[in-house]
Regions:
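N-terminal targeting or regulatory segments adjacent to alpha/beta-hydrolase or S9 domains
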Residues: 1-64, 326-329
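C-terminal catalytic histidine-bearing segment of alpha/beta-hydrolase fold enzymes
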Residues: 5, 276-329
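Short beta-strand element of the alpha/beta-hydrolase
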Residues: 81-85, 90-102
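Cap/lid segment of the alpha/beta-hydrolase catalytic domain
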Residues: 106, 110, 117-159, 217-218
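Gly/Ser-rich "nucleophile elbow"/oxyanion-hole loop immediately N-terminal to the catalytic nucleophile
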Residues: 142-185
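Hydrolase active-site cap/lid region
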Residues: 190-235, 302
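Short beta-strand/loop motif that positions the catalytic acidic residue
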Residues: 255-256, 261-263
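Acidic catalytic loop of the alpha/beta-hydrolase fold
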Residues: 265-270
């Protein structure tokens, strides 16, 4: 392992924990009404007609046709993003790809998938989905309506992902039950909240997911989005009561589809105990796997090799359980 030994942070991004202690972390119990809260939101999201609109993008790629896309989400929010379609193969799979709290300025052309329509939505309030009065920056975004669970922006972002699935099915009806999800950091936490309540998503890949074990998330020092919420908590001590409904680890215990979760031993932006709370919460089914990274949100020796190994692991994961179909995503 090549866990970073030197860094510029005024705290230890390993939090003094070893792989063994991280793997022993258990998810928090669900607050009363957790399932009903999310089931109600999902039911509402299913009533939305996404009305996708497509146009040719200025971006080009030899393997992918690149389209700009917008669709309508809950609260009449317009979500913008990109849709990639294979140039020389049929569309037999769908994939929704989330993003980190830095937003997204372009699609990722290097995902190891084939015969797949890939939708890259921008979360409400960010990048192509900028929406006043939602702050576009991570410290402000994560606080938007935080004291009102029904209106908290994170719930809306989860709904945006569900409606991304609806959008793919509206465009390609034959993709029903053949749509996967990938998300890292912010997008990883959203995925853990979204996947268990949407049975149209057939598997997921989460990378260094945030929002796990909110009590710890509000306690451990960080340079990530939790920092602004920790500051807010000093004058609003009941914020944890609201955030327990948005705990990615609690939600992950309800996941029933194959999962590949990559978590880091060192991470200044998403504390490893919070990441492992999510990964450990995923039920230990046959095709579920945890992939260990030496670090997240930080460059380190061996990072290129580990990222390549994870990419190859993802390639295989996306092909599982698919006789006669070359890619699952």
């Amino acid at each position: 392992m090549t866990i970073p030994k030197t860094h510029p942070f005024p705290f230890d991004p390993t939090y003094g924990m070893t792989l063994d202690t991280l793997c022993a972390i258990v998810p928090p119990e669900a607050p009363p009404g957790f399932d009903a809260f999310w089931q109600k939101r999902y039911k509402r999201a299913l009533t939305i007609d996404p009305q996708p609109a497509l146009k040719q993008s200025n971006l080009t790629h030899p393997a992918w046709q690149v389209l700009d896309i917008t669709y309508t989400s809950t609260d009449d929010v317009t979500i913008g993003g990109w849709l990639l379609l294979p140039r020389d193969a049929p569309v037999r799979r769908g994939l929704v790809v989330g993003h980190g709290y830095g937003g997204r300025d372009a699609p990722d052309f290097d995902l190891p998938v084939e015969q797949t329509a890939i939708l890259f939505p921008c979360a409400r309030g960010m990048s192509r989905s900028a929406q006043a009065p939602i702050p576009p920056d991570a410290p402000g975004h994560v606080l938007h309506n935080i004291d009102s669970p029904d209106d908290y922006v994170i719930g809306g972002c989860v709904e945006d992902l569900w409606i991304a699935v609806s959008t793919l099915q509206a465009l390609y009806p034959w993709l029903a039950n053949r749509i996967g999800y990938i998300g890292g950091s912010f997008g990883g936490g959203l995925g853990a909240l979204a996947i268990p309540f949407d049975n149209r998503i057939d598997r997921g890949h989460l990378i260094v997911p945030t929002f796990g074990d909110r009590k710890q998330w509000l306690t451990l020092p960080t340079v990530g989005s939790a920092d602004s919420v920790q500051t807010y908590q000093k004058t609003h001590p009941d914020v944890l009561d609201h955030l327990r409904l948005f705990d990615a680890a609690t939600s992950a215990t309800r996941i029933k589809v194959p999962m590949l979760v990559a978590v880091a031993l060192f991470d200044p932006a998403v504390a490893p105990p919070c990441q492992f709370a999510v990964a450990n919460a995923v039920p230990p089914l046959k095709y579920n796997e945890i992939f260990i990274l030496d670090a997240g949100h930080f460059d380190y020796p061996g990072m290129t090799e580990q990222n390549f190994a994870l990419r190859e692991k993802l390639r295989g994961f996306l092909k599982l359980h698919e006789p006669g179909i070359s890619a699952l995503a």
